Structures are given as structure tokens and as C-alpha cells.
Swiss-Prot record:
Organism of provenance: Escherichia coli
Name of the protein in its database record: Colicin-E2 immunity protein
Record's keyword terms, sorted: Bacteriocin immunity, Plasmid
Highest taxon of the lineage: Bacteria
Keyword RNA-binding attributed: no
Amino acid sequence: MELKHSISDYTEAEFLEFVKKICRAEGATEEDDNKLVREFERLTEHPDGSDLIYYPRDDREDSPEGIVKEIKEWRAANGKSGFKQG
């Protein structure tokens, strides 16, 4: 998977696949997985960072789809760019 410069370079479906890859820990090494998590934190800019993946709130669906939904809602509420259309 090609990593992109910003979250607005991803369609929602592409970003969901990125999150699924993190959740499945598909990196060749633990360091590869850690790099993906750091990239997730950079792209999302969400204050909860990787806790969105590993320690979800009780009122949120604990799935890649739930993670993406929370990011999308938080970014919209905070005036940040959304996903690329397409």
C-alpha cells in the first residue's frame, strides 16, 4: 500500500483499507507495524492517536469502520480536511 501525504489524498475506502492493515498487524516486522501506527497518528491528527485503535471508547463500534467513522466526524467538527471524493 502506498502511503500518501495527507488524509485528503485518501478516499474513505482507501483509508479504511489502511486502518484494516494496521488492525491485522500485516507488517513484515513489528517495526513495520509501528511505522504504520505512527503514520496513522500523523494523518489523522486526532488527539487520541493510536488509542482510537487499541483503546476505543465504549460508545464507539470497535472495528476499522468505527475508527474511520470517528476520525471522519472529529475532522469535520474541527474544521479539518476530509477524505478525497471518488
